Amino acid sequence: VHLTDAEKNLVSGLWGKVNADAVGAEALGRLLVVTPWTQRFFEHFGDLSSASAVMNNPQVKAHGKKVIHSFADGLKHLDNLKGAFSSLSELHCDKLHVDPENFKLLGNMIIIVLSHDLGKDFTPSAQSAFHKVVAGVANALAHKYH
Protein backbone atom coordinates (compact mmCIF):
# COMPACT_ATOMS: atom_id res chain seq x y z
CA VAL A 1 0.00 0.00 0.00
CA HIS A 2 1.31 3.42 -0.83
CA LEU A 3 0.65 6.22 1.59
CA THR A 4 2.07 9.68 1.31
CA ASP A 5 4.03 11.07 4.23
CA ALA A 6 1.04 13.28 5.01
CA GLU A 7 -1.26 10.24 5.12
CA LYS A 8 1.17 8.34 7.35
CA ASN A 9 1.32 11.29 9.73
CA LEU A 10 -2.46 11.60 9.71
CA VAL A 11 -2.93 7.91 10.51
CA SER A 12 -0.35 7.86 13.30
CA GLY A 13 -1.63 11.12 14.78
CA LEU A 14 -5.23 9.97 14.88
CA TRP A 15 -4.30 6.51 16.13
CA GLY A 16 -2.78 8.18 19.18
CA LYS A 17 -6.21 9.63 20.02
CA VAL A 18 -8.15 6.37 20.17
CA ASN A 19 -8.59 3.78 22.87
CA ALA A 20 -7.22 0.88 20.85
CA ASP A 21 -8.54 -1.81 23.19
CA ALA A 22 -12.09 -0.44 22.92
CA VAL A 23 -11.79 -0.09 19.12
CA GLY A 24 -10.65 -3.71 18.79
CA ALA A 25 -13.38 -5.07 21.04
CA GLU A 26 -16.12 -3.12 19.29
CA ALA A 27 -14.84 -3.83 15.78
CA LEU A 28 -14.64 -7.58 16.35
CA GLY A 29 -18.00 -7.56 18.12
CA ARG A 30 -19.62 -5.71 15.23
CA LEU A 31 -18.08 -8.16 12.75
CA LEU A 32 -19.58 -11.11 14.62
CA VAL A 33 -22.99 -9.43 14.88
CA VAL A 34 -23.24 -8.06 11.33
CA THR A 35 -21.68 -11.09 9.62
CA PRO A 36 -22.79 -14.00 11.83
CA TRP A 37 -21.16 -16.63 9.63
CA THR A 38 -17.82 -15.40 11.00
CA GLN A 39 -18.87 -16.72 14.42
CA ARG A 40 -17.89 -20.24 13.34
CA PHE A 41 -14.25 -19.32 14.02
CA PHE A 42 -15.15 -18.30 17.57
CA GLU A 43 -17.56 -21.01 18.73
CA HIS A 44 -15.30 -21.67 21.72
CA PHE A 45 -16.00 -18.12 22.96
CA GLY A 46 -19.26 -19.20 24.59
CA ASP A 47 -22.49 -17.24 24.24
CA LEU A 48 -22.73 -15.50 20.88
CA SER A 49 -26.51 -15.90 20.65
CA SER A 50 -27.44 -12.22 20.40
CA ALA A 51 -25.89 -8.84 19.66
CA SER A 52 -25.83 -8.06 23.38
CA ALA A 53 -24.19 -11.39 24.20
CA VAL A 54 -21.51 -10.83 21.56
CA MET A 55 -20.77 -7.23 22.50
CA ASN A 56 -20.51 -8.10 26.22
CA ASN A 57 -18.60 -11.36 25.78
CA PRO A 58 -15.24 -11.10 27.59
CA GLN A 59 -13.54 -13.44 25.13
CA VAL A 60 -14.68 -11.33 22.17
CA LYS A 61 -13.33 -8.24 23.91
CA ALA A 62 -10.03 -9.95 24.72
CA HIS A 63 -9.56 -11.23 21.18
CA GLY A 64 -10.54 -7.85 19.75
CA LYS A 65 -7.81 -6.32 21.90
CA LYS A 66 -5.30 -8.86 20.59
CA VAL A 67 -6.35 -8.21 16.98
CA ILE A 68 -6.16 -4.44 17.29
CA HIS A 69 -2.72 -4.60 18.92
CA SER A 70 -1.48 -6.58 15.91
CA PHE A 71 -3.08 -3.95 13.67
CA ALA A 72 -1.36 -1.20 15.68
CA ASP A 73 1.99 -2.97 15.35
CA GLY A 74 1.40 -3.01 11.60
CA LEU A 75 1.01 0.77 11.66
CA LYS A 76 4.70 0.90 12.56
CA HIS A 77 5.53 -0.97 9.33
CA LEU A 78 3.37 0.72 6.71
CA ASP A 79 6.12 0.31 4.13
CA ASN A 80 6.31 -3.46 4.69
CA LEU A 81 2.90 -4.74 5.74
CA LYS A 82 3.43 -8.15 4.10
CA GLY A 83 6.55 -8.67 6.18
CA ALA A 84 4.88 -7.38 9.33
CA PHE A 85 1.92 -9.74 8.95
CA SER A 86 3.72 -12.73 7.43
CA SER A 87 3.41 -15.05 10.44
CA LEU A 88 -0.22 -14.07 11.07
CA SER A 89 -1.01 -14.66 7.41
CA GLU A 90 0.51 -18.12 7.62
CA LEU A 91 -1.41 -18.91 10.82
CA HIS A 92 -4.76 -17.78 9.42
CA CYS A 93 -4.17 -19.59 6.12
CA ASP A 94 -2.57 -22.88 7.14
CA LYS A 95 -3.92 -23.51 10.63
CA LEU A 96 -7.14 -21.53 11.08
CA HIS A 97 -8.36 -21.63 7.45
CA VAL A 98 -9.99 -18.21 7.70
CA ASP A 99 -11.57 -16.92 4.51
CA PRO A 100 -9.35 -13.94 3.58
CA GLU A 101 -12.45 -11.91 2.71
CA ASN A 102 -13.04 -11.69 6.47
CA PHE A 103 -9.96 -9.48 6.82
CA LYS A 104 -11.61 -6.90 4.57
CA LEU A 105 -14.84 -7.14 6.54
CA LEU A 106 -13.01 -6.58 9.82
CA GLY A 107 -11.16 -3.64 8.27
CA ASN A 108 -14.51 -2.09 7.39
CA MET A 109 -15.64 -2.49 11.00
CA ILE A 110 -12.46 -0.80 12.21
CA ILE A 111 -13.21 2.15 9.91
CA ILE A 112 -16.78 2.39 11.24
CA VAL A 113 -15.64 2.34 14.86
CA LEU A 114 -12.90 4.90 14.20
CA SER A 115 -15.39 7.15 12.46
CA HIS A 116 -17.72 6.97 15.44
CA ASP A 117 -14.99 7.44 18.04
CA LEU A 118 -13.07 10.23 16.31
CA GLY A 119 -16.11 12.19 15.16
CA LYS A 120 -15.23 15.29 13.17
CA ASP A 121 -11.51 14.51 13.46
CA PHE A 122 -12.20 11.59 11.10
CA THR A 123 -12.14 13.80 8.04
CA PRO A 124 -12.53 12.55 4.47
CA SER A 125 -8.72 12.62 4.19
CA ALA A 126 -8.41 10.55 7.35
CA GLN A 127 -11.01 8.08 6.15
CA SER A 128 -9.22 7.71 2.83
CA ALA A 129 -5.88 7.12 4.55
CA PHE A 130 -7.33 4.55 6.95
CA HIS A 131 -9.08 2.79 4.07
CA LYS A 132 -5.69 2.41 2.40
CA VAL A 133 -4.23 1.05 5.62
CA VAL A 134 -6.96 -1.52 6.30
CA ALA A 135 -6.86 -2.61 2.64
CA GLY A 136 -3.09 -3.02 2.92
CA VAL A 137 -3.40 -5.01 6.13
CA ALA A 138 -6.11 -7.24 4.62
CA ASN A 139 -3.92 -7.82 1.58
CA ALA A 140 -0.92 -8.63 3.78
CA LEU A 141 -2.95 -11.08 5.86
CA ALA A 142 -4.19 -12.77 2.68
CA HIS A 143 -0.66 -12.94 1.22
CA LYS A 144 0.05 -16.57 2.19
CA TYR A 145 -3.19 -17.68 0.54
CA HIS A 146 -1.75 -17.01 -2.91
UniProtKB/Swiss-Prot annotation:
Keywords (A to Z) from UniProt: Acetylation, Heme, Iron, Metal-binding, Oxygen transport, S-nitrosylation, Transport
Residues reported to bind heme b: H63, H92
BP-aspect Gene Ontology terms: hydrogen peroxide catabolic process
GO CC entries: blood microparticle; haptoglobin-hemoglobin complex; hemoglobin complex
Residues recorded as bearing N6-acetyllysine in the entry: K82, K144
Domain Globin positions: 2-146
Superkingdom of this protein's organism: Eukaryota
CDD domains for this protein: Hb-beta-like
InterPro entries listed in its UniProt record: Globin, Globin-like_sf, Globin/Proto, Hemoglobin_b, Hemoglobin_oxygen_transport
Family matches, as SUPFAM superfamilies: Globin-like (SSF46458)
Sites of S-nitrosocysteine modification: C93
N-acetylvaline: residues bearing it: V1
UniProt tissue specificity: Red blood cells.
GO MF entries: haptoglobin binding; heme binding; hemoglobin alpha binding; metal ion binding; organic acid binding; oxygen binding; oxygen carrier activity; peroxidase activity
A Pfam family: Globin
Subunit structure: Heterotetramer of two alpha chains and two beta chains.
Function: Involved in oxygen transport from the lung to the various peripheral tissues.
Family named by the database record: Belongs to the globin family.
Name recorded for this polypeptide: Hemoglobin subunit beta
Primary gene name: HBB
